[in-house]
Design a protein with these regions (language model features):
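C-terminal His-loop and adjacent cap/lid subdomain of alpha/beta-hydrolase
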Residues: 1-569
Length: 569
């Protein structure tokens, strides 16, 4: 601990996987990091952070050193809890011939189950006759005749009875308690010593957390559910970085499905995790009159962390990110609390450098813009904010007031090769039954009510790139149109629907003649930049400005400029 900086950096593992070394160290991914490749450039170690992970999610495979948690099941005084549940099954490869259910069915009698299918979210599902499917076992189903593949891109829903729900909300307590132990204790109740001590006292002076995507939504839900206060009423996390995460999770419910993302553009529209409240500050739901906010409980207990919320363009289209900074009806901008920064990463895709969908499922080339430099900048800024009170760089995000946050109907750039999305995912209020506030879902399937929270998206310029937010040089000195969304191809099924978590990139033509041949209105690379030296100088100026404002680290400015110098066309 003598070489440490006093800060614990805790990662909420995404589906049991360790990701902060690839994200913050540009390292090779591994759940058992042991080599120089797994350490990458050593950024976190050079900064002196103590790294911590633990399991919080159940039901994960034991392979690949995933971090898991074993949980008790909930029961009634009279015996097992049995309820009707549902799974949604969507395949993006052509060879899927069996489907694994989240829970074991209490009976393989087909009369007690139902399989439905639809092509698009907006369609009514069709019941698949019992003679066209069967149980393989209590947790697996397949189509008939045996060997029939599930249709790629079709949305299947399977309704069945299950028993013995695990108490998945314990995951929140597992996170709270391990971090509280590391920060405050010298030993646990059994006498096991805390390894993070110095001179017989806890060595940590502050605690930071980060989660990406699913685990970022878990982090927002952790805060919302009041777990940033430990059992001794102390602060758990001093600072948090929820990343590409605008909703919450399907965790603290009976028969939860923690790995679900709701929504995902095509399918997965009816699971908990995207309901009010959306914003960090308290707001009033116009449909129910309920007042609530992500930070309501920690505000009441004076245990809120400082937050840098990092989102991509994908969250606006897929997950209602606009509602984090507007009122629930999308009519006016709101002001995040003083302890929150919103860094909206301009024209960035959720997946960054690692596409989610197999090749061919999305209709356009992937947007692989690397947003990791902004994550590294966020960590250093957050740590400084927590440690000595230096305010983190200001929020940057699209706003209604200046016309940078708009209805999607205003977006239609005339770009060859652009397959325009119908619009962002709608945000209906869902009816899960009268006991949803107790974590009990009594309607399978839930019902989408007529009430709609209005979702807006970032405006774009003549090139099709977003006009507001925190823009990397890839966007301010562009080589093409980068989008946080894409649409599904004919091959991928659900044609025209949003393509999961991937974005699209449509490069500029190299020359004026080339763009005129395709009637591309966007100036070509040759028309924009005299040569690579001109391009590189502009990239350097853009990166230096971000560094000056505190969003980029000097070593990442250097990396970005060196990469630009290698670009040729």
């Amino acid at each position: 601990m003598t070489k440490g900086n006093g800060a614990l950096f805790y990662e909420l593992a995404n589906r049991g996987n360790k990701g902060i070394l690839p994200r913050f160290n540009y390292a090779a991914g591994s759940n058992d990091p042991a080599t120089a490749q797994h350490a990458g450039d050593g950024f976190l170690m050079r900064q002196g952070y103590t790294l911590l992970w633990n399991g919080w999610m159940n039901g994960l495979p034991a392979a690949n050193n995933t971090l898991r948690i074993e949980l008790p099941v909930a029961t009634n005084p009279s015996g097992p809890i049995v309820e009707t549940v549902w799974d949604e099954l969507l395949f993006n490869e052509t060879e899927a011939k069996q489907a694994r259910l989240t829970y074991k069915a209490t009976s393989t009698d087909q009369a007690q189950a139902k399989l439905l299918v639809r092509e698009h979210n907006s369609e009514e599902p069709t019941v698949i006759p019992a003679e066209r499917w069967e149980f393989v076992d209590a947790q697996t189903v397949r189509l008939l005749p045996a060997g029939t593949p599930f249709k790629i891109g079709a949305i299947y829903q399977f309704i069945y009875k299950a028993a013995n729900p695990p108490v998945t909300g314990i995951g929140f307590a597992a996170t709270r308690d391990i971090v509280s132990f590391a920060r405050y204790a010298t030993a646990d109740d059994a006498g096991t010593p805390n390894p993070l001590t110095a001179g017989g006292r806890p060595a940590l002076t502050r605690t930071l957390s980060q989660g990406n995507s699913q685990s970022g939504r878990y982090l927002r839900d952790f805060l919302y559910s009041g777990f940033n206060e430990d059992e001794a009423h102390r602060v758990v996390f001093d600072g948090s970085i929820p990343t590409v995460a605008s909703g919450r999770t399907f965790l603290n419910y009976r028969f939860s499905q923690v790995g679900r993302i709701n929504p995902a553009g095509h399918g997965f529209m009816f699971f908990p995790g995207s309901e009010f409240p959306f914003a960090y500050e308290n707001q009033t739901d116009p449909f129910t009159g309920k007042s609530d906010g992500i930070l309501a409980r920690c505000t009441a207990s004076n245990t809120c962390p400082k937050v840098i919320h990092l989102n991509s363009g994908t969250e606006y289209w897929q997950a209602g990110q606009s509602l984090v900074t507007t009122d629930p009806l999308g009519q006016r901008d709101t002001t995040p609390p003083s302890n929150v920064r919103i860094w909206s990463m301009t024209s960035i895709a959720h997946q960054g450098v690692n596409p989610a969908m197999p090749k061919g499922v999305c209709a356009m080339p992937y947007n692989l813009t690397d947003y990791r430099p902004l994550m590294r900048g966020a960590l250093v800024a957050l740590d400084r904010w927590v440690k000595d009170g230096t305010p983190a760089p200001a929020s940057r995000y699209p706003r209604i007031a200046d016309g940078t946050l708009v209805p999607s109907v205003k977006l239609n750039p005339a770009i060859p090769g652009l397959a325009m999305a119908k619009g962002p995912n709608e945000k209906p209020r869902l009816d899960f039954g009268p006991d949803i506030d107790k974590g009990i879902i009594s309607k399978a399937l839930p019902v989408a009510l007529k009430d709609r929270y209005r979702v807006l998206v970032p405006n774009v310029d003549a090139d099709g790139n977003e006009t507001a937010g925190l823009a990397l040089p890839d966007i301010t000195v562009p080589t093409g149109t980068a989008m946080g969304w894409s649409v599904r191809s004919e091959f991928g099924g659900g044609t025209g629907e949003l393509c999961y978590l991937d974005g699209a990139f449509i490069p500029f033509a190299k020359t004026k003649a080339e763009r005129e041949a395709t009637k591309d209105p966007r100036p070509s690379l040759a028309e924009r930049y005299r040569d690579n030296a001109d391009y590189s100088e502009r990239v350097k100026a853009a990166a230096t400005a971000l560094e000056r404002d505190g969003y980029l680290l000097p070593e990442d400015t250097k990396r970005i400029v060196e990469r630009a110098a290698k670009l040729t066309w």
